Amino acid sequence: MGLFNFNFGEKPATSEKKAEDFGRNIKATLEFKRHQDPGKDQATGMSADWLTEKGKTASIQDGKAIEENSVKGYASPKKRAQETVDLMLDNVYTSPAYSVDVINKSTASLEGTGAEKLNNNQREENKFNIRTRQELDATANFVKIMPIASAWAEEQLKGGAKLDKYSLIVQWYLDNPEKCKENGVLTGHETAAEIAERVAVELGMTERFYRNSVVRLINVTHGPKIEPFLQELVGFKNLAEIGGALQPGESINFAVRIDANKRKTVKLLFRDKEYPIDEAQIKALAQEYRDRIEGRK
């Protein structure tokens, strides 16, 4: 299914599509989620590219909790992110009285239909039937700064720091853009621009949904990807201000509402708090990402 060809919501009575058929009475949730609990690479301290049983169980439970009429999932190219989405989509609750339209079916649900052959030519890293997005990928070369950030976090803990070690590692990342540049790691601001690109695209997509759509778009990414983006939007200096870094499986959500007159409101929801957002700020950040990608060509 093409990126902009979402047939969510109330379909037009005829095959002729008119402007008034789209972008009215829309309820959409754009979910940006850290993948569920992964294994651990003991040599580097980084996440291994698979989910633990705990992570798999949590993904299944998240899928069962989905209530929107239509849902679609995207993920980082990493398997642990794809598996998180795959398990969610494969466990969306349906019954004769209530049905959720899962736009991209999981690999398991394709077995025996012949459609599973579509996956035979996928690269190994694209193991699941999930649309991957490079903007959601893990921060490249983060392993190069992990020893420095980890050592700093240990020192902070010895000094009585209240945050957990992982949150302190993310805090070091946010506070040291120059060290990141020296090690070939994207800065927090650059990482924020990647997530902004995905958010900007999906905010635009909501305006092209059929009228009366109730949709959830799931985007599974990594730590620390969401925290720098949150810092740009919310303006905190220390992660303690928002309760620490995101834990495995934790999300931020954009609640999008478009009324019958195409007036759109967007709120950022995180840890039982609502934050107003500036779409222009998100678009500007996204443009930085696009300019950076264009500069590589």
Briefly describe each language-model feature range.
Residues 217-229:
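Active-site beta-strand/loop microenvironment that shapes enzyme catalytic pockets
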Residues 282-296:
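Low-complexity intrinsically disordered segments
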Residues 30, 212-220:
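Residue-level preference for the first positions of well-ordered beta-strands
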Residues 4, 8-137, 178-197, 226, ...:
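Active-site-proximal alpha-helix that buttresses catalytic centers in soluble enzyme cores
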Residues 129-170:
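Short acidic, low-complexity segments enriched in Ser/Thr/Gly/Pro
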